[in-house]
Design a protein with these regions (language model features):
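Structural/interface elements that position substrates and couple domains in central-metabolism enzymes
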Residues: 1-130
């Protein structure tokens, strides 16, 4: 993502999903922990959303803005990272990313979308670990 954007300095980055897995507020070994730390170290303006784990995550990273919805998280973002496969994320459409984000650039660590569908929908999409 840094190679694509050149810098994260003062760039809004959306993070969807903080929990280790859906249906829990458990953060143990959650990929979001290290990745958010790296984004902060590179100067990103990180905005996170998780329907259950946000409060626990905010205790660890009180400086991070926690959004109240997916739409608020994506609004004006230059890129989005998905770290938990919550059902409400799976239901998102390429149009939602295009409409809300400044740059519809998505890095999906859970492989919840079909890459071809996202690309046809106008989203620059990277499925990590597929």
């Amino acid at each position: 993502a840094k190679k694509r954007l050149m810098t994260f300095e003062n760039v809004k980055v959306a993070v969807l999903g903080l929990a280790f897995k859906p249906g829990t507020d458990d953060l143990r070994e959650a990929p979001a922990l290290d990745n958010v730390r790296l984004l902060l170290e590179h100067g990103a303006d990180v905005v996170c959303y998780d329907p259950i784990a946000a409060a626990n995550f905010h205790k660890l990273y009180p400086q991070i803005k926690m959004a109240n919805s997916v739409e608020e998280t994506l609004e004006g973002a230059f890129c989005c990272f998905i770290f938990t496969e919550w059902e409400e994320f799976i239901r998102l459409t390429p149009e939602t990313f295009r409409r809300k984000m400044r740059v519809p650039l998505v890095y999906d660590g859970r492989n919840i979308f079909d890459p071809e569908h996202m690309k046809r929908g106008g989203v620059e999409y990277y499925s990590i670990g597929r």
